[in-house]
Design a protein with these regions (language model features):
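Positively charged, solvent-exposed patches that mediate nucleic-acid binding
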Residues: 1-112
Length: 112
């Protein structure tokens, strides 16, 4: 199994984020943010099957990953971020997804 230091991969990591993390939301995404003990900011992406078929869900995942890649240099280090995609996020363009996540990151005080 590949080791991804900048990804949340274990079920227990997600459960900790849901239980202890602070929750922020908008029309397209819900994010859970919590501090971790590592020097990197890690990303986890989830969504319900209600969002749509695998093609739609994977497109939203790609949008979130790309937006996170662009914003990562501005984010505080040592945080776990879980992004939950909502059904309306399937119609987003890349710039819209990035703007939405940037607003949420600002509200969560992740942007330095």
């Amino acid at each position: 199994m590949k080791v991804h230091p900048d990804k949340l991969t274990r079920k227990s990591e997600f459960q900790l984020g849901y239980r202890i993390g602070r929750k922020y939301w908008d029309r397209y995404f819900v994010i859970y943010v919590r501090a971790n003990n590592s020097p990197t900011t890690r990303l986890g992406i989830t969504m319900s099957k209600k969002v749509g078929g695998s093609i739609k869900r994977n497109r939203v995942r790609r949008l979130v990953r790309e937006s996170f890649r662009h914003l990562k240099s501005q984010l505080r280090l040592g945080m776990d971020v879980i992004v939950v995609g909502r059904q309306v996020a399937t119609g987003l363009k890349c710039q819209q997804a990035q703007a939405s996540l940037c607003r949420l990151f600002r509200r969560a005080r992740l942007v330095s």
